Amino acid sequence: MRVRLCALGLATLLGAAPARAADAPALEAALHGWLAALLGPGVALSDRPVQLVPQDNHWAMTVPVTGGIGDGLLLLGAPVTATLRAMDGGRWALDAIRLPPDLRLSAATPQGESVWTLTLRDQDAHAVIDPALATTSSWDGRFGGYALHWQGPGGERQTEAVHVVSHLAWQPAAAGRIDVTATGRSELLTTNARMDRQGLVSFSAARTDAAGHIDALLPARVPALIQAALAAAPLLTPDASRHMSPELRGALGAVLDVAGDLLAGFGEQVTMRDVHLHTRGMDLAMRMLAFGVNVSAPDGRIALKLHFAMDGLDGGAALPGGVGGDLVRHIALTPRLTGLPAGRVLALLHEALAHGGEDPALPAEAAALMRDNPLAVGVDDFSLELGPARFTAAGDMQVLGADQVSGQARLRATGIDALIRDARDQPALGQVMPLLVFLKGLGEPDGDATVWNIAYTGGHLTVNGTDLSQMVPQK
């Protein structure tokens, strides 16, 4: 509520034009109050975190960034500058936004100091902001020569992109909430990391497109979300999962406190082109790699949907027989999970964080959660193009516990006979040829395709009516 009241006061002040020196103190004070409410007590603001100088019909805005912004966090860089112009309806126009071309952030953590250095060679950004959230607000930025370097406990990492384009919009939704959407594109993205445990890891993509959304976000909870993220971010080092400090547990607990506010719906989809990955003992190339996640809880129960797709895999010597892009042409998988109550899941995660995952009661509580709330697992889409063959599948499974699982699926394939013939001459397929022949024997013809109707219940696995229970591992 404090953020909304500050924003309304800010909109009223900004509605006055032209820019006058006499108005600067009141406007700066309003901006100070708005930022203080948004960032919380963890960020110590200066007396003038935003400085305004009137110039004709707009303000020249300067935002100093050097200084402490939280417990153990220190920023060093040139000020952010922009022109600020009042628009109709209390909106702002922010033009000629310029971020620090060189920005350094250091964070003191229990494992040691982490340092991030951001470099921007070229930039062009502008925004339209409605502090009252009554109309659509937006941000658009174009950056060239993007580079982000991290060094800290466990290693160092350098990420670069020739061009980065970003767009962010938030607009009013029902019941005083807002919908947030974001898109981004990078060209010639590369990441090179040297980690103490993994050695050298290199990744590159000729082009990356990303899109994300948060639905029906409650504005009053935005400050808590930002403050929780600020507290947790510097503690998430590569070794954090192995050495989870009490500070990190507390910060992640605060994130969980506000996570329920995101369950109206949020998600992200990323698509990469011409991807290369090198790690110790592995070199992979893909023409396309896509992945995504969508989470919501429309009826108080979590609905999770994942997506993964890949075209033209070339694994070189890393995969059996040297799997090439002409063999694994396409893979796509879209699984979903529904049924677990959001409140109980968040409470269980809170308890696991509080005890570092070592509470002996946690397994029993997790089992009770599954027993009381049947978990539905499904695959909406599965497709695999392997040489001349194409496999597709869909299915559903109900989980009441580790020993109470039932489900059904339908697998369909075309070109499997040609694939079996090719397996005689291709080393990459020779190792799986017995499996292909076995599957073909279980299948039933369906025109030019082969189908497998699969069912599992009461410990019995059947494929097209044939009981294969003896092949299922038993306790």
Model feature map: region roles:
Residues 1-7:
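Bacterial N-terminal signal peptides that target proteins for export
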Residues 17-21:
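Sec/Tat signal peptide C-region and signal peptidase I cleavage site
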Residues 7-15:
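Bacterial N-terminal signal peptides
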Residues 22-475:
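Glycine-rich, small/hydroxylated-residue low-complexity segments
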